[in-house]
Amino acid sequence: MVKAVVGFGAACGISAIVACLWAALVITNDINDMYDDVMGELGGFRDISDDTWGTLLDVRHGAGESAEQYVRGIFGRHKRSNSQCSCGLPSQGCPAGAPGNPGAPGEPGGTGPDGKNGPTGLPGLNIPIPNDFPKECIKCPAGPPGQDGLPGQEGFQGLPGDAGKRGTPGKDGEPGRVGDIGDQGTPGQDGQPGLAGPPGRDGLTGKGQPGVAGRPGMPGPRGEPGNNGNPGEEGQTGAQGPTGQPGKDGFNGNDGTPGQAGPQGAVGADAEYCPCPERKRRRV
């Protein structure tokens, strides 16, 4: 939308400029035409005045008066002489005296009498005009070319012309000679790494002799402790060891439950004293 508005405004501005230029050209052309018309009228008036002036001079020449006297009689001024008395004796061979001071300016002369009427002109001729008389103006032969006039003012700049047509393509020129080898240029920047190529074919197994064994490498660092091993199998029963020393007497156990009543005993023998139990030895 903004582009359309800007384009419309630009088109209106260009149209206004073109219209102003066209109006200026039209006005300038009208002024030149009016100037030519005025100069033509002035030339005609000048011709008429020259003819009239020549006629007046011819009339005065017929009366015995020169043209210079006639002009002075019209445009000149008759000075009045100062009233002086000429009663003295006239000079006889005396040298001329010094020039006197300029006299006072005279009074303006009065209006001269009107000139006499000119002679009556010849009566005009009544020339019949035939019907087949050409209505166009009579073309007089061209006079000698006049002097060059003053250079005119610089005209307005014309409107831009249309774009010229595209010319035909020219012929290919002859190949030029091989030029000299130029100076070595600066090394270019490193290119970008290329794309990965397709996988190559499988290589052939070499048939060379085995090489000499290399030197043993340095011992590597100590590894981490291994995991605990599985429990070993139960070993065979060993030989019986020597008899250990008798242990300490244990604590008396709890009384057992009373047993069942035994059968009735047989009649015992006559009463006798039971033998005493043996005395136990204390072990250290």
Curated annotation (Swiss-Prot):
Residues 88-284 are annotated as: Disordered. Nematode cuticles are composed largely of collagen-like proteins. The cuticle functions both as an exoskeleton and as a barrier to protect the worm from its environment. It comes from Caenorhabditis elegans. It comes from the Eukaryota. The gene is dpy-5. GO terms for molecular function: structural constituent of collagen and cuticulin-based cuticle. This is Cuticle collagen dpy-5. GO terms for cellular component: collagen trimer; cuticular extracellular matrix. May be a substrate of bli-4. InterPro entries: Col_cuticle_N, Collagen. Collagen polypeptide chains are complexed within the cuticle by disulfide bonds and other types of covalent cross-links.
